[in-house]
């Protein structure tokens, strides 16, 4: 797992209080990890702060899984 993926995973665990083994690339924030719309907004803000990237609203709406977040951040930092 990449450094970005590890950091995303830690943020998700800290914000949602879920078990580490549930935070896999294919895990949906809402369907698999129990996040609500406020949680997803807070996650996006935490990703922006941690990685120093801006995630526009339209992009945030397409970040539905842990893997989506990792891919967006990797692309934004490239």
From Swiss-Prot:
Carrying O-(pantetheine 4'-phosphoryl)serine, the residues are 37
Which PROSITE patterns does this UniProt record tie to the protein? CARRIER, PHOSPHOPANTETHEINE
Pathway listed for it? Lipid metabolism; fatty acid biosynthesis
| A Pfam family annotated for this UniProt entry | PP-binding
- Pull one GO CC term from this UniProt entry: cytosol
The known PTMs are summarized as: 4'-phosphopantetheine is transferred from CoA to a specific serine of apo-ACP by AcpS. This modification is essential for activity because fatty acids are bound in thioester linkage to the sulfhydryl of the prosthetic group.
| Keyword annotations of the record | Cytoplasm, Fatty acid biosynthesis, Fatty acid metabolism, Lipid biosynthesis, Lipid metabolism, Phosphopantetheine, Phosphoprotein
Q: List the subcellular locations.
A: Cytoplasm
Q: Which GO terms describe its biological process?
A: lipid A biosynthetic process
Q: Which Gene3D superfamilies match?
A: ACP-like
Please tell me where this protein is predominantly located: cytoplasm
**From what superkingdom does this record's organism come?**
Bacteria
Q: Where is the Carrier domain?
A: 2-77
Keyword match Cytoplasm: yes
Q: Which GO terms describe its molecular function?
A: acyl binding; acyl carrier activity; phosphopantetheine binding
Which InterPro entries does the annotation name? ACP (IPR003231), ACP-like_sf (IPR036736), PKS_PP-bd (IPR020806), PP-bd_ACP (IPR009081), Ppantetheine_attach_site (IPR006162)
Entry-linked PANTHER family = ACYL CARRIER PROTEIN, CARRIER DOMAIN-CONTAINING PROTEIN
**Main function:** Carrier of the growing fatty acid chain in fatty acid biosynthesis.
Protein family (similarity comment): Belongs to the acyl carrier protein (ACP) family.
Q: Which NCBIfam families match?
A: acyl_carrier, PRK00982.1-2, PRK00982.1-3, PRK00982.1-4, PRK00982.1-5
| Identification of the protein by name | Acyl carrier protein AcpP
**Organism expressing this protein natively:** Rhizobium leguminosarum
This protein's encoding gene: acpP
């Amino acid at each position: 797992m990449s450094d970005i993926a590890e950091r995303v995973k830690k943020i998700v665990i800290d914000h949602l209080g879920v078990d580490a083994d549930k935070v896999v690339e294919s895990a949906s924030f809402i369907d698999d990890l129990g996040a609500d719309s406020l949680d997803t907004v807070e996650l996006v803000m935490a990703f922006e702060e941690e990685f120093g990237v801006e995630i526009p609203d339209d992009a945030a709406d397409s970040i539905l899984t842990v893997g989506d977040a990792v891919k967006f951040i990797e692309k934004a930092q490239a």
